[in-house]
Amino acid sequence: GDGKDISLLASYWRTYLPDTLFVCPDAPERCSVSDTGFQWFDLMDQSKEQVLIKSLVAEIKLNTLIDEVIKKNNLTPEKIALSGFSQGCMISLQTGIKRKNKINSIVGYSGKIIDTEHLQNNINSRPHIILMHGDKDQIVPVSFLLEAKEFFNTNNYKVESKILQNCEHRIPTEGSSLGLEFLKKNLY
């Protein structure tokens, strides 16, 4: 959940999307497994119910930030795209799908759906979605990409996906380029 991590991606994208505002927040909590990092919610030693409860708190915070950015910059929700890595992807999916005012897109890297039953019961919009995941990810296994794809297909979403070869828990150049092309196609 470090904003500086995703800001590296934003710096690359900014070159090709010059009229785009990038907001790269830190997640709201200090990371439970690292003194220097941040997290949207604690995944360690938590029950499924506790993870959902904590993710709902994070979702409120992200929604508040989205609404502030929209108001401050005189934007419409259709001009908003969320992008996240790992937990950032997870909270972007949950928040973006549940928003009543549909955002444009979600670019997700190495994440998963936090709680499919909860999300199934709270679908409010259908943003454009691309999910990417490394085939060698040992932090968030690639099987979660396949589960998310199945969820979205079952719920009549058109979702793009890419399994990145020989990639661990990170965003490789190929992934950043695919995310950029996806945003160019959907935002402009």
Name the predicted role of every residue range.
Residues G1-L75, K79:
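Serine-hydrolase catalytic machinery in alpha/beta-hydrolase-like enzymes
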Residues I6-S11, P141-F151:
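Short alpha-helix in the alpha/beta-hydrolase fold that links the catalytic acid
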Residues L8, Q94-K98:
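Active-site signature of alpha/beta-hydrolase-fold catalytic machinery across serine-
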Residues L82-G84, Y109, M132:
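Short beta-strand immediately N-terminal to the catalytic nucleophile in serine-hydrolase-like folds
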Residues G84-G88, S92:
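Gly/Ala-rich beta-loop-alpha elbow adjacent to hydrolase catalytic centers
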Residues N101-I113:
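A conserved short beta-strand
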Residues I130-H133, D137:
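Short beta-strand/loop motif that positions the catalytic acidic residue
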Residues L146-Y188:
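C-terminal catalytic histidine-bearing segment of alpha/beta-hydrolase fold enzymes
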